[in-house]
């Protein structure tokens, strides 16, 4: 959520370069533990390189300085709001049962606890961890 807000502000509103950008993270535990983040947006050829650099610098800024407190609060409040809503979805319970079985934890309770205890520092450390991994793939598709 935080990066989505950053990118709406910079890539869309300030630069007028895209209708929207999305940042999605995923944690995988098997067969190996892995964290991934995908940042995606569409733009015109003329602005592609500039927006790509702005997207990277927005993420790097969070790793270096931590997230903006207002954006952090909005993101956490949104996550808290989604918890009871998610519990009405089969996919939530499928994931909760699978995670509980594989990791031996009560996903339903632990997820809510994790959201409630999330700090600005946690977000900054997660960003640092992703950047310091050194695994970075950049894909730019341009028309011929």
Task: Identify what each model region corresponds to.
Residues 121-128:
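Mature hydrolase/peptidase catalytic cores and their serpin-fold inhibitory cores, especially
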Residues 1-8:
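His/Glu-based metal-binding/catalytic segments typifying zinc-dependent metallopeptidases
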Residues 8, 12-117, 134-143:
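M16 family metallopeptidases and their MPP-like homologs
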